[in-house]
Design a protein with these regions (language model features):
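N-terminal positive-inside, membrane-proximal cytosolic segments immediately preceding the first
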Residues: 1-39
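Terminal, low-structured helical/coil segments at or just beyond the last alpha-helical repeat
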Residues: 23-24, 28, 203, 207-252
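Short solvent-exposed coil/turn linkers within tandem alpha-helical repeat scaffolds
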Residues: 107-117, 131, 146-155, 181-190, ...
Length: 252
């Protein structure tokens, strides 16, 4: 018997015990039981009804989000000329992003309180970016960035940093990446946010700042045996780029 089943059986035993005590009390206090019982029944109906409705909405939101993701991942006609009949394609990435965006926005508007709805808002921001609608993208991603869920907020901040970099607002991008680098998100691990920050510094010509950040990642991202972690390996490569070989140099 797995742990989940044991927990469920324990809850059922507790419920049975409480019910038995309740029946004994009701036999001795009939009038009070009628009055209190009516109120409790109403409360239970509200709670159970609300929980059922929330589950139903979450499932509906997940299905709608899945449909939107299917559109977002649909093949482009130029990349898949021999697509089987019935498979929808798009002429280019912008058209695909626009179609998916409409669906993501609808899911976010209708199911915004559910987790799929929150992820739909994030994807709405991403697809706005791909459409070139920077204003709408910023608005959506700012909302995601302020989410109470740290992992969801981190996704919003990372995408927003990318948007700001595209817009030439590097100072704003740096602040977001610095914030992510100090966090503990699982969706945007701190070390990888720091790598992004180093790359941004490098693109701005701030080589000393880039090397400083990469060196910090290289020194800190290690396992228990002192071996470099994934981010540490990337940081090491950034700090010590391999020169192009003779064959590569001739081909350039």
């Amino acid at each position: 018997m797995d742990n989940a089943t044991k927990r469920q059986l324990k809850k059922q035993d507790q419920f049975i015990t409480l019910t038995e005590h309740g029946v004994d009390w009701a036999k001795q206090n009939t009038q009070q039981a009628i009055i209190i019982g009516a109120a409790v029944v109403v409360l239970i109906l509200l709670i159970v009804g609300g929980y059922t409705l929330f589950n139903h909405r979450s499932n509906a939101a997940a299905n709608a989000f899945g449909d939107a993701m299917q559109t977002y991942q649909a093949p482009l006609a130029s990349q898949a000329p021999n697509v089987p009949p019935g498979i929808k394609t798009f002429p280019d990435a912008k058209a695909r992003a626009s179609a998916a965006n409409t669906q993501f926005v609808a899911v976010a508007d209708q199911y915004g309180m559910t987790q799929p709805g929150k992820m739909a808002l994030y994807m709405a921001g991403v697809t706005y970016m791909e459409e070139g609608n920077n204003g709408a993208a910023e608005e959506a991603l700012k909302k995601v960035s302020s989410s109470w869920n740290g992992d969801t907020a981190a996704l919003g901040k990372s995408a927003l940093a990318g948007l700001y970099e595209q817009m030439g607002r590097n100072a704003d991008a740096e602040k977001l990446l610095e914030d992510l680098g100090k966090g503990s998100s699982s969706t945007v691990p701190p070390y990888f946010a720091q790598l992004q920050l180093g790359d941004l510094y490098q693109s701005e010509g701030k080589t000393a700042d880039a090397k400083r950040v990469w060196a910090q990642v290289k020194d800190k991202d290690k396992d228990a045996k002192g071996n470099p972690g994934p981010a540490g390996q990337v940081a090491s490569e950034r700090l010590n780029p391999q020169p192009a070989g003779p064959g590569m140099a001739m081909s350039q």
